[in-house]
């Protein structure tokens, strides 16, 4: 069984699709004359599907890697920002402590 055959969607297999369609117009389809073309088409469609799946997996891995890198960058930026805020608060508290000592 194969998916709906569309020359536009399965461009790599277009010649085989056309050949099978032509073969099916004759009575040879009832006597197995189209079987060879059908098997070649099935192999072509399988290869096409596997190639697309491989590309999709590679793209997903790349997207996942980019997302992970962005997440790590955001974590680093957040740590830096948190450290700066803490340093500023420490400076303020030290300045307030120093100002309090001068008043006594």
UniProtKB/Swiss-Prot annotation:
| Membrane topology according to the record | Peripheral membrane protein
- List each copy of the CHCH domain by range: 10-52
Residue span of motif Cx9C motif 2: 34-44
Q: Which cystines does this chain contain?
A: 13-44, 23-34
State any GO CC term: extrinsic component of mitochondrial inner membrane
Could you cite one Gene Ontology molecular function of this protein?
copper ion binding
Organism domain of life: Eukaryota
Q: Where is this motif: Cx9C motif 1?
A: 13-23
Q: Which InterPro entries match?
A: Cyt_c_biogenesis_Cmc1-like
Coiled-coil positions: none
Q: Note the Pfam families from the entry.
A: Cmc1
Any Gene Ontology biological process: mitochondrial cytochrome c oxidase assembly
Keywords attached to this Swiss-Prot or TrEMBL record, sorted alphabetically, are:
Chaperone, Disulfide bond, Membrane, Mitochondrion, Mitochondrion inner membrane, Repeat
Q: Where in the cell is the protein located?
A: Mitochondrion inner membrane
Regarding protein family, the annotation reads: Belongs to the CMC family.
Q: What function does this protein fulfil? A: Required for mitochondrial cytochrome c oxidase (COX) assembly and respiration.
Supply the domain comment.
Answer: The twin Cx9C motifs are involved in the recognition by the mitochondrial mia40-erv1 disulfide relay system and the subsequent transfer of disulfide bonds by dithiol/disulfide exchange reactions to the newly imported protein.
Q: What is this protein called?
A: COX assembly mitochondrial protein 1
Q: Which gene encodes it?
A: cmc1
């Amino acid at each position: 069984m194969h998916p709906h055959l569309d020359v536009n969607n399965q461009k790599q297999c277009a010649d085989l699709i056309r050949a099978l369609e032509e073969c099916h117009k004759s009575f040879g389809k009832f006597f197995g004359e189209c079987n060879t073309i059908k098997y070649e088409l099935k192999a072509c469609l399988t290869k096409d599907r596997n190639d697309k799946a491989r590309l999709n997996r590679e793209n997903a891995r790349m997207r996942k890697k980019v997302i992970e890198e962005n997440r790590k960058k955001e974590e680093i930026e957040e740590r830096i920002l948190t450290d700066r805020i803490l340093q500023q608060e420490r400076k303020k508290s030290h300045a307030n402590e120093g100002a309090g000592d001068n008043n006594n």
